[in-house]
Amino acid sequence: MISSNEFKTGLTIEVDNDVYTIIEFQHVKPGKGAAFVRTKLKNVKTGGIIERKFNAGEKVPKAHVERREMQYLYKDGDHFVAMDNETYEQTSLTEAQIGDGVKYLKENMNLGILFFNGTVIGVDLPNTVILEVAHTEPGVRGDTATGGSKPATLETGAVVQVPFFVNEGEKLIIDTRTGNYVQRA
């Protein structure tokens, strides 16, 4: 159990039998009435965000989330197989557990897998990945009426907006959190 006075960003807690990460918190002491803590919580399983108030000093169960470094191996039907880097034990992941990150998965990529009570509750991808451009239209000189970018399909099937000078076969650095082009690799 942890007191609401000890809340900090990134802490994982159990609320209504679900695991949440605190993404924002604020101690509020109104002129009249008892103090409380206003929080913004992100559901680790679904990614949904809720706002919740806790009384000052209220005890909340702390969720003991274990993070294991694993390597993504291959896709097997609807499942994605990852191997623990220490024990070599293989774990099968679903598309729902990986979320939007499935667009950036590449074989032999290292992932952070989050476990709660022995069950996978989330997957942390690296902040950036290097992917090759599989298809993009050639940039036409002087064609900046559309804002200076064009769509490019990457080797994993993800589509991102890239500058006109990017050509097929080039390797790009992509931010997995936003899905945006960062730079050439």
From Swiss-Prot:
<comment type="function">
    <text>Involved in peptide bond synthesis. Stimulates efficient translation and peptide-bond synthesis on native or reconstituted 70S ribosomes in vitro. Probably functions indirectly by altering the affinity of the ribosome for aminoacyl-tRNA, thus increasing their reactivity as acceptors for peptidyl transferase.</text>
</comment>
<dbReference type="InterPro" id="IPR020599">
    <property type="entry name" value="Transl_elong_fac_P/YeiP"/>
</dbReference>
<dbReference type="Pfam" id="PF08207">
    <property type="entry name" value="EFP_N"/>
</dbReference>
<dbReference type="Pfam" id="PF09285">
    <property type="entry name" value="Elong-fact-P_C"/>
</dbReference>
<dbReference type="InterPro" id="IPR012340">
    <property type="entry name" value="NA-bd_OB-fold"/>
</dbReference>
<dbReference type="InterPro" id="IPR001059">
    <property type="entry name" value="Transl_elong_P/YeiP_cen"/>
</dbReference>
<dbReference type="Pfam" id="PF01132">
    <property type="entry name" value="EFP"/>
</dbReference>
<protein>
    <recommendedName>
        <fullName>Elongation factor P</fullName>
    </recommendedName>
</protein>
<dbReference type="InterPro" id="IPR014722">
    <property type="entry name" value="Rib_uL2_dom2"/>
</dbReference>
<dbReference type="InterPro" id="IPR013852">
    <property type="entry name" value="Transl_elong_P/YeiP_CS"/>
</dbReference>
<dbReference type="InterPro" id="IPR008991">
    <property type="entry name" value="Translation_prot_SH3-like_sf"/>
</dbReference>
<keyword id="KW-0251">Elongation factor</keyword>
<dbReference type="GO" id="GO:0043043">
    <property type="term" value="P:peptide biosynthetic process"/>
</dbReference>
<keyword id="KW-0963">Cytoplasm</keyword>
<keyword id="KW-0648">Protein biosynthesis</keyword>
<dbReference type="GO" id="GO:0005737">
    <property type="term" value="C:cytoplasm"/>
</dbReference>
<dbReference type="InterPro" id="IPR015365">
    <property type="entry name" value="Elong-fact-P_C"/>
</dbReference>
<dbReference type="GO" id="GO:0003746">
    <property type="term" value="F:translation elongation factor activity"/>
</dbReference>
<comment type="pathway">
    <text>Protein biosynthesis; polypeptide chain elongation.</text>
</comment>
<dbReference type="InterPro" id="IPR013185">
    <property type="entry name" value="Transl_elong_KOW-like"/>
</dbReference>
<dbReference type="InterPro" id="IPR011768">
    <property type="entry name" value="Transl_elongation_fac_P"/>
</dbReference>
<comment type="similarity">
    <text>Belongs to the elongation factor P family.</text>
</comment>
